[in-house]
Amino acid sequence: MASCNMASAASNFLVATPNVASNTNTSRTTMLFFSSKNYGSTAPRLVVRAAEEAAPPAAAATAEPAEAPVKAAKPPPIGPKRGTKVRILRKESYWYKGTGSVVACDQDPNTRYPVVVRFNKVNYANVSTNNYALDEIEEVK
């Protein structure tokens, strides 16, 4: 019965990798070559080619430091402040027309329900907090 050696099945192996992350105009290629052929009495050879990269220009070190940019004014806070008493206007809510206190308010304008409200009374699932949209609550004076 004939047998096959995996080393003889893959007689040559070549890898060529271009330097993609280079920010210079020169390109660099690294090549690896493995051969299972025996050339006379020498063992198989490994060939590696590599090019040295040029040193980055030192222009950034000699440039004068730029002035700090003027900070833009903070946008006004979204929603009620923490601890504010609010009335719930969402009709399908367990706490509809009830009052609770604001625990947190997400400042991201893309958040659908940014206001977290905590209540003294728990609902049927034994939960005492819920998230609401800005138009589903009103502040109680």
Swiss-Prot record:
**Where, per UniProt, does this protein localize?**
Plastid, Chloroplast thylakoid membrane
Q: Which residues form a coiled coil?
A: none
Keywords noted in UniProt:
Chloroplast, Membrane, Photosynthesis, Photosystem I, Plastid, Thylakoid, Transit peptide
GO terms under biological process: photosynthesis
Q: Does the keyword DNA repair apply?
A: no
Q: What is the recorded membrane topology of this protein?
A: Peripheral membrane protein
The transit peptide of this chain lies at 1-49
**Region entry Disordered: which residue ranges?**
57-83
The UniProt similarity line reads: Belongs to the PsaE family.
Q: What job does the chain carry out?
A: Stabilizes the interaction between PsaC and the PSI core, assists the docking of the ferredoxin to PSI and interacts with ferredoxin-NADP oxidoreductase.
* Name used for this protein in its record: Photosystem I reaction center subunit IV A, chloroplastic
| Protein species of origin | Nicotiana sylvestris
UniProt gene name: PSAEA
